[in-house]
């Protein structure tokens, strides 16, 4: 509801963004807080949450959480800072009970990826459009895949099935891949031969075909739009000339291969695209746990020394 992309497209929406019922979903989250009264909580949202409706939405959220007994802080985090091979900027909101001054927004340990997207995907079997594989075969795992527990020793592979593509799409994919691999250039739809152009609204379709940045440490953001088509997520290997599979998208999000997404392929792509990357979530959880441990230690020290818990000033 607060997406910057969605805001740019709001003139084409049936329901104006300011009337989107999702704007009040935080009230449902607050119901759980009132019921369980945790010391701390965390939730993730898109970058536009603080600027939506001229900032009014964020002020309403702050005010409401304050009324139910919580202080909240919101900071931009990028999944690539957590070892995930993807640029994914999100607002991570952390809240803690009012009066618990020992608590506050955690400091997260940042890990810059030291591998490439190609190395992340290299042990997944090659596919051509419409094909699938249910085992790895003789493929070599990268150190990143091993160290982060993405793949086990079992030779069972799920969700590695790619969409079928038309001959026209395959020709376009090959051009897009060649441009990227030769000089990191993006395909401009208007530069295609007329025989390959089928969309009337060519202005909005200019950057519709995009190759995953295989030779980089981070690729562009995996989106739920993958459920509609794969043109924006073309596999970087020109021999395969296809869009990425659910398993490949899940790997880019840092999901282990043992994680299975239910439902038809469209629903699986939506789940992957909307998810918080597990490696990022793990570090956020560690940071929250560390804050709670620090508070417990300070309170324990108070019992023996009579000291007062220092007030931690945090922006709200």
Q: What are these language model-derived features?
A:
Residues 1, 100-101, 129, 215, ...:
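Short, acidic Gly/Pro/Ser/Thr-rich loop/turn segments
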Residues 147-316:
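C-terminal target-recognition/interaction regions appended to catalytic cores
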Residues 2-199:
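Class I S-adenosyl-L-methionine
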């Amino acid at each position: 509801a607060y997406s910057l992309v969605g805001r740019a497209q709001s003139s084409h929406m049936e329901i104006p963004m300011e009337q989107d019922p999702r704007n009040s979903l935080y009230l449902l989250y607050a119901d759980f807080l009132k019921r369980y009264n945790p010391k701390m909580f965390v939730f993730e949202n898109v970058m536009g949450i603080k600027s939506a409706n001229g900032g009014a939405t964020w002020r309403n959220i702050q005010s409401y959480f304050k009324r139910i007994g919580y202080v909240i802080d919101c900071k931009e985090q990028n999944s690539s800072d957590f070892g995930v091979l993807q640029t994914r900027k999100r607002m991570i909101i952390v809240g803690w009970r009012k009066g618990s001054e020992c608590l506050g927004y955690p400091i997260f340990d940042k890990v810059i990826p030291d591998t490439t997207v190609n190395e992340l995907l290299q042990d997944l079997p090659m596919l051509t459009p419409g094909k699938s594989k249910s085992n790895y075969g003789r493929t070599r795992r990268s150190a990143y895949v091993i160290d982060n527990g993405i793949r086990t020793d079992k030779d069972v592979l799920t969700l590695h099935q790619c969409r079928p593509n038309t001959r026209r799409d395959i020709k376009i994919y090959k051009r897009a891949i060649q441009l990227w691999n030769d000089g990191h250039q993006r395909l401009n739809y208007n530069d295609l031969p007329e025989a390959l152009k089928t969309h009337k609204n060519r202005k909005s379709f200019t950057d519709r075909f995009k190759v995953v940045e295989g030779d980089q440490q981070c690729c562009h953001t995996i989106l739920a739009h993958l459920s509609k088509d794969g043109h924006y997520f073309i596999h970087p290997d020109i021999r395969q000339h296809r869009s990425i599979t659910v398993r490949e998208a899940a790997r880019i999000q840092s999901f282990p291969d043992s994680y299975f997404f239910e439902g038809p392929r469209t629903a699986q792509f939506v789940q992957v695209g909307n998810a918080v990357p597990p490696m990022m979530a793990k570090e956020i959880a560690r940071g929250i746990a560390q804050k709670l441990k620090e508070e417990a230690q300070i309170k324990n020290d108070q019992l023996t020394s009579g000291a007062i818990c220092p007030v931690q000033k945090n922006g709200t």
